[in-house]
């Protein structure tokens, strides 16, 4: 039996990476030299935060997004930690609030002023003190306001409620103490009811973040995970790490059964940590390697092989860290679906890279921009702590659109051809336009309207078929003969469509003449 390549239809097959011009990069940025395997960069629609080198303690820079070009060597820093800063994260519901963690075993919450910093910012709003050793990761809850998670080198995950009026919070609302080694990665599912962790003891765990109990645990010896990621509402986990032969590897897991991975994909023999990023709106997975010069991207599908390789973005400069712009900060006019900010230490440069879907039309592309998470929380901290779960508040990326009311996301989505959900209002609007389009040209010729409308519907129905085959439903050709047959069918279809266009033009001219005659005769009546 001969081998045939597997054809997949995907609107994201031709996505490409577009680096920013030199004028739109951030130059002369003193990026940290820390060996921690973190992103070291956090981005929102207003600011870029990047961990920097600082003597006598830890600090990070907060640069306005529009302030591109060369950075002033004396640019003000956000400093106040006694040890090196290891991680920074913007509050998803407040673009002017950021959390930082440090080797001094504390977490600090900062209010960033809307105007430009003129001097070093040393006054923090809150300080969280609870870890016994340095704190390596911080993560905001995706749906509840003012809930922050932290993990430290004391092998503990702590849950903090920032609604407290105290400026120094000494005790978390919950301490999760089930890990036997350092936590390397944390990830929430869409509504924040589950927390996944990757630990240095080679185990992946799925936890109940409120109860602190372990729901699932992976003891698979063939994959050593460094980073773990929930894949939206697909009930799947993706981890990146190394195989038993020390090759870099990705593994896909069922969140309800972590005994064996669903699939494994070996990449290469490099040693840099792989950072995965998942876009639930497009079902696309991006994999960025520390020290690499490229970005791999895949499309997640429900059918095997699940991870469908699309393309690879190449550049000349290796990245030490990476930042990602939230979807609400993208440029929809250029069909941008993802944006990275590469930290290039060899050139002290931050380079934006936009992932773009090539489209000819400049209008808003509804099919690649379904409703996405907004900057509004769906729960208060107390509601979440009491046991409530809600899906994120969604918003449309169409310019001028308002956030939608909180609504649950679909439990299962069609992965092979992701489409944007359409509101009933849009259907009603479309139906009214179609009805008007069918009546208006023939309002003066009522006796011809029924016959023409019936013919129009019948011919429009035929345009979907070619020689008895539905062009959009038939499978892709697998042999040369099938390909030729499909080509000839399409040629016939094009020829027939041209004839239909010619007929429509003749009908339009006839109608124009009849309307002109009626207008000329109307004064006499």
Swiss-Prot record:
Disulfide bonds: none annotated. WD repeats lie at residues 80-120, 130-170, 178-217, 220-263, 269-308. InterPro entries: Coronin, DUF1899, WD40/YVTN_repeat-like_dom_sf, WD40_repeat_CS, WD40_repeat_dom_sf, WD40_rpt. Pfam families: DUF1899 (PF08953), WD40 (PF00400), WD40_4 (PF16300). It comes from the Eukaryota. SUPFAM superfamilies: WD40 repeat-like. Signal peptide: none annotated. GO terms for molecular function: actin filament binding. SMART domains: DUF1899 (SM01166), DUF1900 (SM01167), WD40 (SM00320). Residues 485-524 form a coiled coil. The keyword Repeat applies. Gene3D superfamilies: YVTN repeat-like/Quinoprotein amine dehydrogenase. Belongs to the WD repeat coronin family. Binds actin. Component of the N-Cor repressor complex, at least composed of NCOR1, NCOR2, HDAC3, TBL1X, TBL1R, CORO2A and GPS2. PANTHER family: CORONIN (PTHR10856), CORONIN-2A (PTHR10856:SF2). This is Coronin-2A. It comes from Bos taurus (Bovine). The gene is CORO2A.
